[in-house]
């Protein structure tokens, strides 16, 4: 509300910390945030399609035979779950092709996917509870095999936050279009609060409906929780319908990211902060074609290099790393711009921002600790959060390269 300019957090970072950190945030959007998010959610779609047909997979020996070691990060297994990865790349190609050919067509497709999303959520929440085939005791019954205690319980709770934070991420996307919103001083805070509340309520209701149908142990061991819950309520056909609707719903999120995310890269290229090639508009289709292709190539590389868990974890970690900086930036702006008009003031300042700052920092430290300890103990072959940090840090030499280049051309 204080800075109603198109660009959202990119603009905030520049005002708070300067050009370097704004550039690094823009780079992170390309290297991790938007691309890992797009690759990760499309991975889910490919996995749910396995409800209908089994995708080919190499033997464990072959999957382990090709391993790329990244110093200080871990090992990448490109052949692991290869069938799902190839289908994921194909789905990303289709979404990119549609966006490349026509922005309008991409918007029409988005409407179809949105309808599927509403149907999927409605059937899951209403249908599962209405079936009467679940058990409310699932909400209070302990599982004999899942009993973390002490510090392990704390780690488990932090790990469980990843899914919730990913589901809620995006509720603030309206800030990217703040410069196009009428009366942003009132409209933005209202839409942000309402959007976050709606997302929280839907997330809790969907989760509750699945807990009602499946005991905790069954949920923990399921690869397709929503379909398994629907299958228990409505049979194989019901599970298939939910799987299909989830695929369409997830493709809607993919389509939105493929449509919008490359435009940040396109804008950075126009500002000569990215290769000029990425800032060229397609002469016929009038779309940021080169930026779209660049994003598709990088998303495909991320898909081959990881799994849904790897992509989701590193994406959420980097998002909340920058969120930490933005929360702290509230205090910076109070000092740098004390007389600026503030249509909306943070409730409970400074205690509420401090509480958010503490939770954010605690979450990041615990995730980093979990990733490193799991890697050292051999539970995982890669440190997801460190992987995201390394990819983000690659933007540092690029910043100085483009800055030096701009200085020479000036």
Label every PLM stretch briefly.
Residues 11-12, 18, 50-67, 141-149, ...:
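TM-loop-TM module centered on a large, flexible mid-protein loop between adjacent transmembrane helices
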Residues 112-116, 175-211, 264:
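Junctions where cytoplasmic loops transition into the N-terminal start of transmembrane alpha-helices
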Residues 47-57, 115-144, 167, 208-214, ...:
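Hydrophobic alpha-helical segments and their helix-loop junctions in multi-pass secondary transporters
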Residues 27-30, 96-97, 125, 207-209, ...:
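Alpha-helical transmembrane segments of multipass membrane proteins
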Residues 1-92, 97-100, 247-267, 307-321:
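Hydrophobic transmembrane alpha-helices that form the core helical bundles
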Residues 40-48, 53-61, 67-81, 104-113, ...:
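Transmembrane helix-loop boundary segments of multi-pass membrane transporters
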Residues 277-287, 323-386:
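C-terminal membrane-solvent junction of multi-pass transporters and transport-like membrane proteins
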């Amino acid at each position: 509300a204080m800075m109603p300019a198109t660009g959202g957090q990119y603009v905030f970072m520049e005002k708070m910390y300067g050009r370097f950190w704004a550039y690094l945030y823009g780079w992170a959007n390309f290297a991790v945030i938007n691309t890992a998010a797009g690759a990760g959610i499309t991975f889910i779609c490919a996995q749910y399609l396995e409800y209908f047909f089994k995708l080919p997979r190499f033997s464990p020996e072959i999957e382990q035979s090709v391993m790329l070691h990244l110093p200080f990060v871990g090992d990448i297994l490109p052949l692991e779950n290869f069938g799902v990865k190839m289908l994921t790349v194909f789905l990303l190609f289709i979404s990119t092709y549609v966006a490349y050919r026509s922005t309008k067509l991409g918007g029409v497709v988005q409407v179809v996917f949105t309808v599927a999303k509403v149907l999927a959520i409605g059937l899951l929440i209403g249908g599962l509870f209405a079936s009467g085939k679940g058990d409310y005791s699932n909400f209070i019954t302990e599982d004999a095999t899942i009993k973390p205690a002490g510090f392990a319980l704390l780690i488990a709770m932090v790990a469980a936050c990843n899914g919730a934070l990913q589901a809620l991420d995006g509720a603030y996307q309206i800030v990217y279009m703040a410069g196009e919103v009428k009366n942003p001083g009132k409209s933005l805070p209202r839409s942000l609060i309402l959007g976050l509340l709606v997302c929280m309520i839907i997330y809790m209701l969907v989760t509750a409906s699945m807990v009602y149908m499946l005991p905790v142990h069954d949920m923990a061991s399921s690869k397709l929780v929503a379909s398994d819950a629907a299958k228990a309520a409505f049979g194989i056909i019901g599970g298939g319908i939910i799987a299909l609707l989830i695929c369409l719903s997830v493709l809607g999120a993919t389509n939105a990211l493929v449509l919008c995310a490359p435009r940040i890269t396109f804008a950075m290229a126009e500002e000569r902060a990215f290769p000029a090639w990425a800032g060229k508009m397609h002469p016929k289709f009038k779309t940021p074609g080169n930026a779209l292709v660049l994003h598709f190539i990088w998303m495909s590389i991320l898909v081959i290099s990881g799994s849904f868990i790897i992509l989701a974890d590193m994406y959420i970690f980097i998002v909340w790393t920058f969120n930490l900086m933005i929360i702290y930036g509230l205090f910076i702006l109070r000092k740098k711009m004390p007389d600026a008009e503030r249509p909306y003031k943070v409730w409970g300042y400074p205690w509420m921002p401090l509480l958010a700052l503490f939770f954010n920092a605690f979450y990041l430290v615990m995730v980093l600790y979990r990733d490193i300890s799991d890697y050292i103990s051999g539970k995982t072959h890669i440190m997801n959060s460190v992987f995201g940090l390394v990819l983000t840090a690659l933007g540092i030499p690029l910043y100085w390269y483009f800055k030096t280049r701009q200085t020479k051309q000036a």
